[in-house]
């Protein structure tokens, strides 16, 4: 996958992406609409409920596999986010069933970001309050988050710790890591 952003001469800002997926998989994509106030919950590797939250912002997006796994979306405040495949570079915290109440599945990070935050700064200030874990060990991800102002960051989790990079280039692909970009 490749994500790009462009700023026009008049200052308008556009984000776009491609989704290429190999291995003969069918992504089962569908449009997703999440209204303000909807109650949501994260999956966990054990099958128990993880983090539970209510949508503060309405969201539209495109999912993969199931509607909770939003690959790319935007909320009513203008915050957008997308996930990108990141195998061999990142690494999440191990799942701890005793902390399920703050556990967020990696494939649901976009859903959580877009329903909870209006800005990148709000997200950065809150990220340590959740534990992002893999539902499938081989599917490590990294994320692109953008504001309507044109500010964009990339979030990567390495060694269980989130790292944010200002993305002034406006491009992100799957692996390798953002510093390579």
Where are these regions (language model features)?
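A contiguous strand-loop segment
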Residues: 1-98, 137
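An acidic- and aromatic-residue-enriched active-site/binding cleft used to recognize and process polar
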Residues: 18-20, 86, 128, 148, ...
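Noncatalytic scaffold domains of N-terminal-nucleophile
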Residues: 83, 118, 143-144
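Extended amphipathic alpha-helical segments with heptad-repeat/coiled-coil character used for oligomerization
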Residues: 140-181
